A protein has these predicted regions:
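Selected alpha-helical membrane-embedding segments in polytopic membrane proteins
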Residues: 1-127
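Hydrophobic alpha-helical transmembrane segments and adjacent short intramembrane/lumenal linkers
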Residues: 112-178
Length: 178
């Protein structure tokens, strides 16, 4: 377990040597896939939590907005809020998560393929598909920082976390591909 902590800390510190160590072991490919899939599922749940909290906030503060809008717009806004709440309360949510997971897995596979093609054709780097997959998977570890979203109701903090972890994940990917 201590070794796993060291790996995670090195990734957060943008240590590009850790990616070389991880990519040299082909057995890390399955771990990278698991990190990627669970990270995207975690991000999806965090985004849904953010949307649900935003709807609750909007519903509670609709009175502040109503005074400046025409009645037809207010009715449309109330209908939209109810429709979104029905999606969260229905069985459609599980289907949405499954389709999100499948789509994110396919987009990740395509992204790894594009990165591999760019590295081998454009940058003329000697690499293989699994190494790029390992780097891509492990660079998604910062996504797990979105877990804070489940414990806070602050909309600005949730926005900051979602955007911040997305940017930090891209920075980690760039550090790993260096």
């Amino acid at each position: 377990m201590g070794n796993n902590r060291q790996v995670i800390l090195k990734i957060f510190r943008l240590d590009n040597n850790i990616y070389n160590e991880l990519a040299s072991e082909i057995t890390n490919f399955q771990i990278a896939i698991a990190i990627y899939v669970s990270g995207f599922l975690f991000s999806g749940l965090a985004a849904l939590s953010f949307l649900r909290n935003s709807l609750v906030y909007l519903e509670q503060n609709i009175g502040l907005i109503v005074g400046t809008l025409p009645a037809q717009t207010v009715n449309e806004l109330n209908n939209l809020i109810r429709e979104f709440q029905n999606v969260f309360d229905s069985q459609q949510l599980f289907g949405l998560l499954i389709s999100y997971l499948i789509t994110s897995f396919l987009s990740g596979f395509i992204t790894v393929g594009l990165i591999y093609l760019l590295l081998t054709r454009f940058f003329r780097k000697e690499t293989n598909f699994r190494q790029v997959g390992i780097i891509y998977g492990f660079s998604n570890i910062p996504v797990f920082l979105n877990g804070i979203i489940f414990f806070t109701n602050s909309i600005p903090l949730q926005i900051f976390l979602i955007i911040g972890t997305a940017i930090f994940t891209l920075v980690c990917l760039g550090s790993g591909l260096k």
